Each structure stands twice: as C-alpha cells, then as structure tokens.
Amino acid sequence: MERTGSTTRRGFIGGATAVAATAALGGTARAAGRSAGGRSVAVLGGGVAGLTAAHELAERGFKVTVYERKDALGGKARSMDVPGTGAGGRRALPGEHGFRFIPGIYHNLPDTLRRIPFPGNPNGCWDNLIAPSETLVARTGREDIRLPIPGGSRRPSPLTLDDLRRTLIGFFETSFRVPAYEVVYFAERFLVWLTSCEERRTRDWENVPWWEFTRAARMSADYQRLLCIGLTRNIVATKAEVASTRTVATLGEAFVFNGLGLGADGPIDRLLNAPTNEAWIGPWVTYLRSLGVEFHTGWAVKDLQLEGGRISGAVLEDSDGARHTAEADWFVSAMPVEHARTTWNADVRAADPQLARCDKLRTDWMTGIQFYLSEPTPIVHGHINHIDSPWSITSISQAQFWSGHDFRRDFGDGTTADCLSCDISEWDKPGILYGKTAKQCTREEVAKEVWAQLKAGLDDTGREVLKDSVLQSWFLDPAVQLGGGRATNDEQLLIHPVGTWPNRPTSRTAIPNFFLSGDYVQVDIDLATMEGANASARQAVNALLEEAGSGAERCTVTSLYRPRELEGFKQRDRLRWRLGLGNAFDVG
C-alpha cells in the first residue's frame, strides 16, 4: 500500500500495490519475483543500508524492490511530521528520531550524497551539508567551554567581552581541574593505541573496556567525565566501564586526524541545511524511483524460506495483516539487527553459524526529543554536549542552519521560530526533577526532565539562555512507548561493549544468494553509524556481484584515514604482539 504525506517530501515515498485478490481469499500473495538472467533483488529494509544497496544495484541494472516495515523510508535517519501542527498552508513542524551528524571522517555516505540529484546543486545532496563554526561543552555549575571548529561554514558568533571572559574561565577551570599529569597520561595512552597493530587492536583492545584502558578508576572526576564517560556515553551510547577500547579509540583517532585536516571528506562537524527528508531522503527516493526501484512500505519481514540451500522467498505482512511472499534471485537483509535476527529461522541459522552469533549483539536507547520555541534561540552555531547531564544529552538549535527557510513562515502555525533538537543517550539513570530514570517517566515527564537538565547546564552561571516563556511544545520520537509499567523502543542503537566485534557478521553469508547490510555488520568504521550502514551495503552489493559473476564495476568502499607515518610503528608492534610482548609505549 502506498502511503503519501501531504506536506513534505515524504509524499514521494510509499509502497507498491498489494496483490489484493489473493489476499482477500486468505492466501499468501506473491510479491515481485525472479527475473530472467537472475537480475531481481529483494532488499529487506528501507533505511540507509537498504536505500544504499538499492542505489548501487539499480545503477548496475538490477531490478530492485525494497520492503520496509515502517510507513516511511529512511530508517532512523528520516525526519517526520509532528501530527496536527501545520496550519495556514504551512508544513507541519519537523520532528526526527535524532539530529543528523555527518562528520568529515565519513567517506562512503558523502559519496552517495554526491550521486543523488538535487535541483540547483552541482554536487547533489552533498551540497546540502553545512558545517557549524563552533561547539559548546555545557558544564553544570561552571562556565561552559565554547570552542571554534576549523573549516566551519562561517566565522564563530561574535564574542562579547562577557562571552570571552566566560569561555576563558570555563577552559581554565576545567583544565586546572584535570591535573597536568593526567592529561599527559591520557595522551600517552592514546599513543599506545595509535601505534598498535591491527592484530592487537582486534584481539586485545577489543576485549579491554575503555575505562580500564584509560585507567579512569584512579583518575580525577573531571578526567573521568571529560575523557572517559562523556566520550563514550554521549557519542557512542555505551558506558565507559564496558565500552570496547577498539571502538572508542577508532572513533577518537579518526576525529583527531579529521581535526588536523588529514584524509577527511570535509570539516569535523556537518549537518543538513533543511529537514532530513527535504535535504536528502526525499530526493534519494525520487532518484531511485527514476532508476526503476519499487517500494513497499508498511510491509514487515516475518520469515525467510530456505530451499535447496538458497533463499527462495521472504514472507512479509502488510499493514492490513495480509501475507505476501517476495520472490527474487537475490536477497539483501538491510534491517537493524534486533529486527533482522527475528527473521532468521532455525534452518537459516543452521546454514550459517555467524547468524546465531548476532543474538549476542546488544542494543540500547539513543533517542531524540525536539523542543519548539517561539523565539530564535541560536545558543551557539553548532552542537552542544551537555556533558554533566545525567541523561547524557546533546543538542543543536536548527533554524539557524536552514538557510532556505523562514521557520515561522514555513512551519507550524506561524508562531514557532526555532527547533532545539536533543538526543538522549542515557535512559537508565535518575534525573534531577523526579528522581526517576527516563524509562520510568511518562512522555510528559521526559520532556520536563530534559528541559530542566538543559537549563541546569546553560542557565547556571547568571545567564538565562533558555527561557520557559518561549517553550511552546515538544515532540518525542514515537518509536518510544512509555507508561503502563513497561518502556519499549522500536528503534534502538547497536552498542559496543567489549567482545562485540567477533559477533558481528560479514556482508557475505554461507547462503549464496543472501547478503547482510546494516550498521551491525563488520565495517572499518566499527561504530554503528549511517556511514557504517552505507559501507556495509556497498560490501553486500560487491559480494552479490561476485556471486552473480557480474562484470559490473564494484562499489568503492573507503576506509578511515590511516597515516603512513605510523605504519613503521605498527609493523614493529606486530612483531612484538606475535612474540607475546606489549606495545612499546605501554608502560602501565
């Protein structure tokens, strides 16, 4: 069934027509089918991984059908309308699972963005990326730390003398609270990582918690908060005490080189210049349709049929409860791991042991809430890390980046001027208002608690940054259900405790016509990200092309930047690792 939206580019997306006659008889309808020459592909999932796979396959002449359980495409990356908020010809207020963050360390996703046509943009949707010029580390009970970002799209906001005074106080206050020897020690620990060979990283550091690697337990509270807890919980949604050093340090290394301008696609921080569906997802789906890709939305995969060692069909249920069997020559599973593994029955799992290992992969909550304000509130020209907030909140004021929009003119009822979009990464610690975890709160309590935590970090040193009088409404990700004694989240995030990497599968499976894509698949970036989803889809397509004996050009899969200057250190460390010795810089 095709579902269209009336006010956004979501009107471009939806499913194809169901086979109603067979469904009406209570049978299982046949969707899509095998093609002459083995060119038909069923992509199971319509998020970043699924759309990337469809993109690469369709450009190589395959007949692609995408099946998505939600009523919209784009997965967790999509934006969405806030129901009932558009008036006077304006679009509904824009909501989202969480704000977009597309750093310069990404290479594969930006390549895809360049290949999505967008009117007036010579580089397609890539030209819709905009770089913030600064960031803010909000400290509760102290002055905040405001930092410029090299390569931003504009100069940082003008500093008043008071701004400068507060920034200097915040910087030195934090610096002096982290003893100099601890800063030096952290740098030395990072050198251990930078000079470690791949074998040591994958087999040793993968199994060491970041907390232990950085010796956080014996360090100051600020060392723990800034360099250990904040880096892991606010960014990778994993507790420092259990987060894999391999995952955290891989990300940290990439950002260091990005900040130095080495091997990057662009500045260290980028976001989109409009709501995501407008700037990216809508144009993407439109382009894929032009290539012949078909979409079924509201169709959930229930089972995979295995015959003769190959997948013969995928059993799906549409939004009306009717069952369909999607037949194709090739199948690409592109669902999040918590949903994908429910579709692998005993026969499918028996065909490839790596599928069963996926049951050990863990997910957690990292979910967004948006606050709609009656006044423009550009706190800083960039993201804010509320590093002391109990719920590990990050935020950004969005209207300042949407250059093609006047917020009041284009969205809502004409009185809303800004959207403060927040991500909540910690749902299991008590807040400051009710003494309850986010999962124990009602939706209304979550909104009030997040607002209070924002103010606690921003309004705590004599300034009123967020005024209660300008708060009009809020929107919490509808995938989250709270109340009634049970909290659920239909769109969770893969997390990376120690020992995760060996349980992550490869894109190629032992079933010759079945391939995996998604941010849980083993990829170079390691962290569950849009970049990882995109790269995994490219890997899956390459495996499919190889299995099909195709002469089509293979997808480019770009790895993170690794400086040649460090290769000699890594080679020597490989020898030490094989001899059972520690890294030469690892002195305890």
Give residue ranges: language-model regions:
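N-terminal secretory signal peptides and thylakoid transit peptides that target proteins
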Residues: 1-19
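N-terminal Rossmann-like FAD-binding beta1-loop-alpha1 element of flavoenzymes
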Residues: 39-65
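Glycine-rich FAD pyrophosphate-binding loop
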Residues: 59-80
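Dinucleotide-binding Rossmann-like beta1-alpha1 core, especially the glycine-rich loop
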Residues: 87-185
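Active-site/ligand-binding neighborhood in enzyme catalytic cores
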Residues: 176-308
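C-terminal segments that line or cap access tunnels to active or ligand-binding sites in enzymes
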Residues: 261-272, 299, 328-330, 335-504, ...
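Conserved beta-strand-loop-beta-strand element in the redox core of flavoprotein oxidoreductases
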Residues: 305-325
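Active-site-proximal substrate-binding core of FAD-dependent oxidoreductases
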Residues: 545-587
